[in-house]
Amino acid sequence: DMNTKQKIKESFQKEHKRASKLVEDPKRSEYLSLKLEGIMESDVNVCVTYDPTKFGPFIIGTTSIPEAGIYSVCCAIQNLWLAARAENIGLGWVSIISNDVLREQLDLPEHIVPVAYLCLGHVTNFETKPDLERSGWLPRLELKDVVYYEKWEQKEGESWNVIQEMIKSNLNYA
């Protein structure tokens, strides 16, 4: 429904403007110029939610890590993203949006957690670099700078060296 999309787009615009006040110029102007949503032009918009009551009061894995259910939803979103890409369908995750507006516009019950608002559609091409890297907003971090072995900030270890070699030989990336 275009009216629903419009209300959600208005939420994006409000949140985007609010977020821009946290950034000083010239970075603010750069932030405001980034394409961070495709709500109106995408073929399909999907609000992905988590229902912590769906499987009853006991859900395996959530007693020690209560957020595990939301993490599982995020993994499902990643799988959807990969499948969309394989089918030449673009997918964007709009995170600059009010969950309260999503709840109101989509009549979500109070216990339902909005996890992601996704925009899917056919695109003319896929960029070789992610948008934020291409625009210079953020650099791509090397795997060795974000993965540690056994201890925080420990970058060396036999298993880690094996993993790095596998990546280098198979993906030409590490």
Task: State what each model feature region is.
Residues 117-174:
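C-terminal helix-cap and adjacent tail motif
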Residues 41-44, 89, 110-114:
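Short coil/turn connectors at secondary-structure junctions
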Residues 46, 54-55, 59-105:
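Small-aliphatic-rich amphipathic alpha-helix that forms the alpha element of a beta-alpha
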Residues 37-40, 108-110, 139:
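Solvent-exposed alpha-helices and their adjacent loops that cap or buttress functional pockets
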Residues 17-23, 107-132:
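A glycine-rich helix N-cap at a beta->alpha junction
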Residues 50, 96, 122:
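Short secondary-structure boundary segments
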Residues 1-73:
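Glycine/small-residue-rich phosphate/adenosyl-binding loop
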